[in-house]
Amino acid sequence: MQVSLVDYRTGYLVDLEGIRQVIGDRLLIVDAIQGFGVVDAPFALADVVVSGGQKWVRAGWGTGFLALSDRAVETLVPVFSGFNATDADGTPTEVLAPARSARAFSVSNPDPVAQARLAAALEEIAGVGIPAINARLAEKVSRIIDLADEFAVEVVSSRAESERAGIVVIAPEPDQLTLLTASLHNHGVTSTTREGTVRLSPHVTTDEETFAMLRGAFTSFASAVNL
């Protein structure tokens, strides 16, 4: 069973405990990129957890990890790997058995600088704690939802804190989509538009100035709609 911890289109946060109960002993593979670093998820229930470090962890591009349970190591067979995906020393020329670890899925030597960036970012997260980060982010997300409600912009992502992480999805009328995205852009607000919806995502460091920019964008949008 393969799932995204947080759906990038809808912002929905899955219930890993519920999924594990339903699928029984089947392998559970989790793409955690949209929630790792801000969601206190029970990752130990998964057999595979994979995530990049460039999003919530803020470690920059070229960072990430793959974690496998013992059962996943025994069950999964790599289709494509590099020369270092074996436990053999040196640079053998013959085809060898893959390593008995997540190393079996590596394709090249690691980047020490990227490793250092990821380690430093994770140390900062560990120092603060995921629950504290999640609580602060929930406040920021709620403020975006409240602003959208104030200006009658429909929120189609979940409002329940147990079903969301850091993505708010709003859905203007189809003929108002371009107007909304233009208003956001003109006020310096970065957003993502997909399939007729607009995604907004704060961070724990999103400040009052940024929320004022978002309010300004919504104000311009609402004024143009009412003309």
For every predicted segment, state its role.
Residues 1-37:
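Active-site phosphate-binding strand-loop segment of PLP-dependent enzymes
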Residues 27-29, 48, 167, 190, ...:
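Structural preference for beta-strand elements that scaffold enzyme active sites
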Residues 45-92:
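Active-site PLP attachment segment
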Residues 87-105:
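The feature captures the short pre-catalytic strand/loop hairpin that immediately precedes
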Residues 99-145:
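Structural signature of PLP-dependent enzymes
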Residues 135-142, 149-187:
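Conserved PLP-binding catalytic core of the aspartate aminotransferase-like
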Residues 176-227:
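PLP-dependent enzyme catalytic core of the Aspartate aminotransferase-like
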